[in-house]
Amino acid sequence: SNFDQAVMRKPNRSYRRYQQIAELVNTAVREKADMLVMPEACTPKEWLPTLARTCEKNHLAVVTGVEHIIEDNCVYNLTAVILPYEEKWTGQWHSVILYHSKNHFAPEEKRMIESLHLRAMEGIESSEAKCDAKYELYSWNGFWFTVYCCFELTSIRDRSIFQSYIDAVIAVEWNHDVNYYSNIIESLSRDIHCYCIQTNTSEYGDSRITKPSKTENKDILRIKGGSNATAHVGTIDLEQLREFQMKAYSGQKEDKTFKPTPPDFDYKGAYERRKGTMFEC
């Protein structure tokens, strides 16, 4: 696998692999998608600048797992968030690459790394806050979201911290236990009351966009898997979600577009996301 080759310091940089990623990006551009989400450990770090230039040219945001990086016998698992933006004074488009460092490596992932006398550098070790996991809150074009990398989702504490603050959770995965993660994503969507955008490798499947709604309506898009990586487009309605969240229970019960918001959900968060005033003094 690409992971095995990467940790053995013989990374796959074949033209075929480049073509596969390029086809996903080209499909997103062709379909006029706002954002493309790709799985964990998907994109080599050397290709990120090229990807960023494509993003700024086409006004496309990308969230992608970065292939494991080895520095001084330490292994890092990063997720790149590439956000295009227009410079206010010149009207020129640029893009910024932001990184999330995986806080919790999967046990098997860590075992394979340590079997090669390497050290899995979890985000909690590489950040200033040694005892707490670190996650980021992103705002792009009025869309508030956060990113989790695979095994991080198994932490109840970690996946609950952004309730009321986000429109969506983006989960990048390389995971064979699709049933377990399916249960997590469905619970997370209702507990945090947000959209969940989950992408897994085509080998294992269950990439999806889900919402906190009735079982028969919850999946906006769901892909079982296959031999080839493909890009599919789904649409989320931020205004519809926020308007629902701003209602009291009686109004939500009559609406029925989504499941009611959970206890302790702060409706003011939806109001501030809508107005773009989150964290303003």
Located regions from the model:
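Active-site catalytic loop in hydrolytic enzyme cores
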Residues: 74-164, 184
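Cysteine/selenocysteine-centered motifs that mediate thiol-based redox chemistry or coordinate metal-sulfur cofactors
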Residues: 125-142, 146-149, 247-281
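Cys-nucleophile CN-hydrolase/nitrilase-fold catalytic domain and related Cys-dependent amidase chemistry
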Residues: 12-100, 175-177, 190-194
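CN hydrolase (nitrilase-like) catalytic-core segments centered on the catalytic cysteine
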Residues: 46-67, 144, 153-262, 280
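Short, surface-exposed connector motifs at secondary-structure boundaries
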Residues: 30-36, 139-144, 164-169
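Active-site-proximal beta-strand elements of phosphoester/diester hydrolases
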Residues: 1-10, 143-152, 170-172
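Sequence-level detector for tyrosine residue identity
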Residues: 15-18, 76, 85, 99, ...
